[in-house]
Regions:
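Transmembrane-helix bundle of Major Facilitator Superfamily
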Residues: 1-180, 311, 315, 321-322, ...
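Intrinsic disorder in cytosolic terminal tails and internal cytosolic loops
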Residues: 1-4, 452-485
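12-transmembrane solute porter fold
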Residues: 5-21, 26-28, 41, 47-48, ...
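C-terminal membrane-cytosol helix-exit motif in multi-pass small-molecule transporters
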Residues: 168-187, 202-214, 231-246, 445-455
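Juxtamembrane C-cap of transmembrane helices in multi-pass membrane transport proteins
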Residues: 210-219, 377
Length: 485
């Protein structure tokens, strides 16, 4: 590996790591943010969802901008903006200001996430990319462990504001590396950005999710809820119609005529809706109901990342050898069993007996699922569509978690006393409702996999698929390695 390649890889790891961790590290700080700035459960949801909504809504256009203007330029602009907006989050005087800054931060992350892996692919030859992507994935897993731990410690010992401020020096280092290591490239002719599709997608998702989150405060009959909901549904329908006719669509709808691609994305949606709900509400429950500190709640989910880091590649290799269908079916069912074990939690929750066993069983099931699922989706797309196929799968995973948390927020708010979790029986009952819904969604994903997945037209090495961080959200781009019809 040359010096330039090493610097490029480090820059990509730092950039994607900062953007990804900021989507999850904030969860351990939500109770502290609520105590400082207010906002109740709705405010907590929006601090998390504003970032995820912007990231998921714009990630496809972020990839398109990289194709048109060059990944180096888009990555540098994205990571620079991310640093500025991290500082804005750290200095936010109100919950509304923080939510706005988080939304803009998510937009910057949508530029960084797809371009980081594209930069690696451009810097390494085909023979070298496997090792480079493996290093990128491995360090992403390590960052996923360190991030929540460091976030919990920072919240307990200093202030929640520093979980955002700490990004600034990392961004400065990343900018220096990327500008020094990656040569500039001009805009690429013949490519256009699907601006209309991007706007329709953002309006569609934003309207629907806003209505779901704010409904408990206003009711369905309020114009504040009804109008955004209608606008969102109409805009998303228009997005689908427009993408069918666009010459250069943001989303290639033809991909969904491929069976494994379509079924795999349905399983992805079910799985990651359940995972997004679980991790959002578990951290809040452990802190506000079970009495854990921010650091302790961050530590609670570390076994999931450790097990996945140890087992995902091994299960990916087994799926390459025996086919993905078994793993895409059995894995989610095992993960669902782990989730059900969280029904043992209550006001007096023991980590060793009530939480840890659930996390371990859940992690084994998730490890069986993620790499085969990602590989199968990619294998059912043409070689020329591998990038967009990965981006779609990434977006489906992120949007699923976003919608899942929004809908469950509506349900849970009906059970809670005072729109927030507290150490009472109503909060325990609300969390157990969340657990059941998560288990059903994840198990449903497994059933979809068993019934719908067939052997792909060509094989993608699952063990080489980048698996994401804490909950292994699929990340953009992976290379097909063999052809088998």
């Amino acid at each position: 590996m040359t010096r330039r390649q090493t610097l490029t890889l480090v820059a990509a790891i730092l950039g994607s790591g900062v953007a990804t961790i900021d989507g999850s590290i904030v969860n351990v700080a939500l109770p502290a943010i609520e105590r400082d700035l207010g906002g109740g459960l709705t405010g907590q949801q929006w601090v998390s969802n504003a970032y995820l909504l912007a990231l998921a809504s714009l990630i496809l256009i972020g990839g398109s901008l990289g194709d048109v203007y060059g990944e180096r330029r888009v990555f540098a602009i994205g990571i620079g903006a991310f640093g500025v907006l991290s500082l804005a989050c750290a200095l936010a005087p109100t919950i509304e200001t923080l939510i706005a800054a988080r939304a803009l931060q998510g937009a910057a992350g949508a530029l960084v996430t797809p371009s980081s892996l594209a930069i690696i692919i451009g810097a390494f030859s085909a023979a070298e990319r496997g090792a480079a992507i493996g290093a990128w994935t491995a360090w992403g897993g390590i960052a996923a462990i360190v991030g929540p731990l460091a976030g919990g410690w920072i919240v307990d010992q200093v202030s929640w504001r520093w979980i955002f401020a700490i990004n600034v020096p990392l961004v400065i280092v990343t900018l220096g590396l990327i500008l020094a290591a990656v040569p500039p490239a001009g805009a690429r002719s013949g490519r256009r950005v699907d601006v209309v599709g991007a706007i329709l997608c953002v309006v569609g998702l934003g309207g629907v999710v806003f209505a779901l989150i704010e409904q408990p405060n206003h009711g369905w009959s309020s114009p504040v809820i009804f109008l955004p909901l209608v606008v969102g549904v109409v805009a998303f329908a228009a997005f689908v119609v427009y993408e069918r006719r666009a010459k250069e669509p943001m989303l290639e709808l033809e991909l969904f005529t491929h069976r494994n691609f379509a079924v795999g994305n349905v399983e992805t949606f079910a799985m990651y809706a359940g995972l997004g709900i679980l991790f959002f509400f578990l951290v809040i429950f452990l802190q506000q109901v079970a009495g854990y500190s921010a650091l302790e709640s961050g530590l609670a989910t570390v076994p999931v990342t450790v097990v996945m880091f140890a087992l995902s590649r091994r299960f990916g290799a087994l799926a390459d050898r025996h086919g993905p269908r078994l793993f895409m079916g059995a894995g989610p069912l095992i993960a669902a069993v782990g989730i059900v074990l969280l029904l043992r939690t209550g006001l007096d929750t023991s980590y060793a007996t009530d939480v840890l066993p659930a996390m371990l069983v859940f992690a084994v099931g998730l490890s069986m699922t993620v790499a085969p699922l990602t590989a199968t989706v990619l294998a059912d797309a043409e070689e020329s569509d591998a990038g967009i196929a990965s981006a779609v799968n990434n977006a489906v995973a992120r949007v699923a978690g976003l919608i899942g948390v929004s809908i469950l927020g509506v349900v849970v708010a009906q059970t809670l006393v005072g729109d927030t979790f507290a150490a009472n029986d109503e909060s325990v009952r609300a969390f157990h409702q969340v657990v059941v819904v998560c288990a059903v969604l994840v198990a449903g994903g497994g059933i979809v996999g068993v019934l719908g997945i067939v052997n792909p037209r060509r094989t993608v090495e699952a063990r080489n698929c980048p698996g994401g961080q804490l909950v292994a959200v699929p990340l953009p781009a992976v290379e097909s390695t063999t052809a088998a019809d």
